[in-house]
């Protein structure tokens, strides 16, 4: 399979984004004559993140891009030669130069699907040496993407469907790649937009942003714009000096608010006028550079009303400090009173945007009934996942040469499930998930209405379940290196995530002390586990 041009260049994973022991194992396999043994690995996690009962599968598109472009360049091989033993057979490095993923097959949970412990997010099969080399980069691509998508989904559940969520954590992210990944998968998880321009260009994430305090403080009030005139929104009639018009309105606003006309900061007003001249149809004011009540709010109202006289409507205001909930409620009261006073009904519904180190607890307060907040900007708490910085994904060998393999350990949680498997979601009559079931790939596909004997984790006896619907979970994504079907767009995966979460029961969806979702084994898979634990051959 020829290497494909990577449209995102350095933003993508590369073959040497890996741990050295993958290369040392590759040499060991090659030296043992096992490089081309047929093998299968599964990528999964053992516990749902953040103490919850669900995760979202993400990162598949990045994995596909990586696999289709996988080739070791001469420089890669030369570097490996420099860190492997100097007496390594040169034929091994020639073997590396010829590697690609043309014999690799991948089955996967679609991006945006609900994922649960032990259920593979990816099944990767192909020559042993190649699929071993894929372990670290695939974990890197899937684990953080799934973690941040799940984190974003939790924040969306707290915010509810009406609040707009803006991801604005690029400057807080763990490096450029972390920032791009966070912006991409916070959108998949339910955020509405991102401040990250590169995520918009490369991934199609809707972008949003206005102005910072530096823009406001850069103005003193003495500046004269080169063209202070603004034409009416309808395009007819002479232009108007917006700064002069805002000054006229300021006197009326200050009288209405009981302020002296000298109290609002002139530099802040000049900044608002400059921004309004640049964005007359998208004017927003940042209110808390000096004083929300004595400066930011009256200056915003003066400029907004001047724009309104020309047929434009201000979009919103932003708060970045203080008691955000209380300020938003008070600002909304001012907007309603000003709308009535100046007979501009649209002013009542101007958006109120808030930001300032918002975490789950603060978000719950801002989302409560009676909050007047419309848009919530979240940075650090979404991109860094402070409650749990790692998903804990693993990539484990389950079969070699068609024979099952199992990791046996004294820690039952770290035992792996052997063999090539199929995964199914068992659904109730209302379409809500009841449990996921893993079975051996060669077993018959379970049918809706069929009574199934299954083994819950750690159970001493099987139980029975009769699903109303059965949903296969793993889709054939790559077969012998070829894409089997077009991947969904990011927006489509986002829609799937929202639909999947809406179908999950409230007991499993709640964020504190949720009911744990069961992943069960078929009788044949449980029997295989028991035989291998007893030291018997499969």
Curated annotation (Swiss-Prot):
Listed GO biological process terms: NAD biosynthetic process via the salvage pathway; response to oxidative stress
Reaction it catalyzes: nicotinate + 5-phospho-alpha-D-ribose 1-diphosphate + ATP + H2O = nicotinate beta-D-ribonucleotide + ADP + phosphate + diphosphate
EC number: 6.3.4.21
Pathway: Cofactor biosynthesis; NAD(+) biosynthesis; nicotinate D-ribonucleotide from nicotinate: step 1/1
Binding note for cofactor: Activity is highest with Mn(2+).
Sequence positions that bind 5-phospho-alpha-D-ribose 1-diphosphate: 380
Effect on the protein upon substituting residue 380 to A: Partial loss of activity
Database matches in InterPro entries: Aldolase_TIM (IPR013785), NAPRTase_C (IPR041619), NAPRTase_N (IPR040727), Nic_PRibTrfase-Fam (IPR007229), Nic_PRibTrfase_pncB (IPR006405), Nicotinate_pribotase-like_C (IPR036068)
Location of Phosphohistidine modifications: 213
Record keyword Magnesium present: yes
Xref: Pfam families: NAPRTase_C, NAPRTase_N
Phosphoserine PTM sites in chain numbering: 537
GO cellular component terms attached to this protein's record: azurophil granule lumen; cytosol; extracellular exosome; extracellular region
Compartments in which it is found: Cytoplasm, Cytosol
Domain of life: Eukaryota
Keyword terms, alphabetized: Cytoplasm, Ligase, Magnesium, Manganese, Metal-binding, Phosphoprotein, Pyridine nucleotide biosynthesis, Transferase
Cofactor(s) recorded in Swiss-Prot or TrEMBL: Mg(2+); Mn(2+)
Annotated consequence of substituting residue 169 to A: Partial loss of activity
Sample GO molecular function, one term: metal ion binding
Function: Catalyzes the first step in the biosynthesis of NAD from nicotinic acid, the ATP-dependent synthesis of beta-nicotinate D-ribonucleotide from nicotinate and 5-phospho-D-ribose 1-phosphate. Helps prevent cellular oxidative stress via its role in NAD biosynthesis.
Subunit structure: Homodimer.
PANTHER family, per database record: NICOTINATE PHOSPHORIBOSYLTRANSFERASE
UniProt protein name: Nicotinate phosphoribosyltransferase
Organism per entry: Homo sapiens (Human)
Lineage, broadest ranks: Eukaryota, Metazoa, Chordata, Craniata, Vertebrata
The encoding gene: NAPRT
